[in-house]
């Protein structure tokens, strides 16, 4: 079980983010309105952008510390990231896309683990295809597989179902429930029913600040307030 602890500040134009929270494994939902700072936060955890000030720690590894001038490079953080649109390489086969993360992290090939993930996500029959020949749901499952084959300590999912229609979302949700037992996750979404099915804890963001943290009851209270 990976513990993530962060205390960060970041200004982007007129937007100022100041967030502090800890997670203790499971699936932590980042919930809030558009522009609340959810994607900015996961990009800082991944190392894609640096906080102006603060500290990010995963288990006993300090990933970022402005005071100590620590900023671990993206490829050394061992954090998987699945974006809204999957971001597969269109010129590579599914097999080559899956292998990309492992190679970038310098990991040895593990045939048994690869076979297990192919079975977990039901993508073994897609290996010879190019992303352009996949459905939206298949592309996202391949993106999940690529992230898992990095053997991540943490998986970041930024609106992974937002680009899918309702049938494809129903197709993917059972696979996400399986992933919940594979690796700790930070899951970004503004869709409460989706989070209620997957999340084990919630961080509510409002205009760049942490408004509340806790269990699913935080989500219930937030959605009730929005509807009220």
Residue ranges and their predicted role:
Residues 63-80, 104:
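ABC ATPase NBD coupling module
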Residues 183-189:
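Conserved H-loop
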Residues 61-66, 109-126, 177:
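Conserved ABC ATPase "signature" region
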Residues 169-182:
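Helical segment within the ABC ATPase nucleotide-binding domain
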Residues 130-134, 138-140:
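Conserved ABC ATPase signature
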Residues 149-153:
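A short, proline-enriched helix->beta-strand linker immediately N-terminal to the Walker B motif
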